[in-house]
Amino acid sequence: MVTKTNDKTKNAATTTYKRTEYPRPQFKRDAWMNLNGTWKFAFDDDNKGERNGWAQRPDFATDINVPFTYETKASGIGEGTFHPNVWYNRTFSIPEEEVGKRVILRFQASDYVTKVWVNGTYIGDHVGGNAAFSFDITNAVQLTGENQLVVKAEDSQSCYQPRGKQRWKDENFGCWYVQNTGIWQTVWLEFLHPERIDNVKITPNIDTNSVVFDYSVQAFSDCKLETIVSFEGKQVKQFSVTPDRANMTFEVDLLSDLMEWRVAHWSPEHPHLYDVTFRLLANDEVVDEVHSYFGMRKVSIKDGQVLLNNRPIYQKLLLDQGYWKDTMLTPPSDEAMLEDIEKTLAMGFNGVRKHQKLEDERFLYLCDKKGLLVWSEMAATYEFSDEAIENFTKEWLEIMQQHYNHPSIITWVPFNESWGVPNIFQDKKQQTFTESIYYLSKSIDAERPVIVNDGWEHTISDIIALHDYEEIGKVLYERYKVKEPILNNEIPHNNHKYAFADGYSYKGQPVMITEYGGIAFNHESGWGYGNQVNTEEEFLERYRNITDAIKALPYVTGYVYTQITDVQQEVNGLLTEDRTAKIALEKIKEVNDG
């Protein structure tokens, strides 16, 4: 049953929490219809809705504030109990000026199996909880009057589906939290001509001062595709091509005398972005226009160092699970995301490792603008099977392609701490699976580093990422000061965990400590790593000692501190769940800058 909430609470949720922004700044169209807001909602624990015709005759009594899941306060429901099937319903009308165009229904994310009906007609389904997807609903809509949109989301507690930090038990445990069911990112409509731009993959090359555009279009032979590149409002390049096939590739020289250095690079210190507009014309009429942007930056590895724009970069990252108290995995607003980014930078970190969450694209957009580095990490499965392999691989490839153009993303992390591959140390099948994901990732993105198993038991990784929650700085330093015993698998670095899986060895990759710290203040409930501290002075002493120990290791090229905020029962954040600083931000910065 739905938790009873009074009208005042529901109205407050709808008024306070709204997602009105265009959901994908990397591929923005000016004309769109936001479907966020109040929908009708129902639980279907007995899975009887399809049999009983709910899709054709929706009669749901409860309101829900989309895109917030029923588990959140922001939804207006706020019930943590797991429900395997949930239904949504709302109406929409086609604007008069859009009649005659294709009607595309888009979901930025919905967890886990999403089924869609329009006016009682089944449209299709999507499997996966993190990637965006869409349906062409043109043939099912009425051009005048109201259209009925019905959505069913099916979730489970299966460990074969990528679930990240969502619990698979009825209660929270360890570092796993309340599940995330159904629509959790923006839903919207776009109205497009049959001739349209489907996608553009943008690959910068700072060594040749050029950028490669991989276009995917639906166009006839008499169409023309224009690309206009500008920087800070000044046009840098413009060119046109005649599409002679659905997929085309063009490389463009970006050197321009309009700019002081002829080309502007993207970096944390100077996050320069080029704006780009793509226009598709049919018979000299603009039939589609998309706005995007890109950053000229390069990520590479040489001599045990990660290079950004051909220069070594020491990464000081913060583990960020992307949870909010009242909205959980759904960011409450642009302002909330920007607050996290600005506080991260204010503490002297230059990036985040988005842990077990594929983040909202508007967060990535803000990182692109602010110069905050991002490691993008897949949500884990927790058992190994053919089904898990298929689920994981499909969704990971979707996410890589969806997030490829963001310059702030500099590392891909498909696996963490052997989750989903629990016997990887010796199991050849599990080892081979991680290798296959590595090479598939490289086939889509040859440049960015891929960390196959963040924490331990690496197979093939471009960065050797190790986790260690030792709370005494001197002990931490002594463990790592001579790198060979750990990197040659002579000794484990984390209890019984070794750096490499059996049969694999160190090849000179960069080494980073990618989880450490996790210090919690004394708390009557919840947990952190190691002994809890009572005062700011105790916290800073430990933080300084363990951070300085890592920075004193000449072969270690960076670190990831756990973590930015408290998350439910895990209370080891530098900020509380409501983003109140536990320690003065400048004092954390002083240690990071030291």
Question: Where do the PLM segments sit?
Answer:
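Secreted/periplasmic carbohydrate-active enzymes, especially glycoside hydrolases
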Residues: M1-K354, L366, V374, E395, ...
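Substrate-binding/catalytic cleft of secreted carbohydrate-active enzymes
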Residues: I341, G351-R579, K587
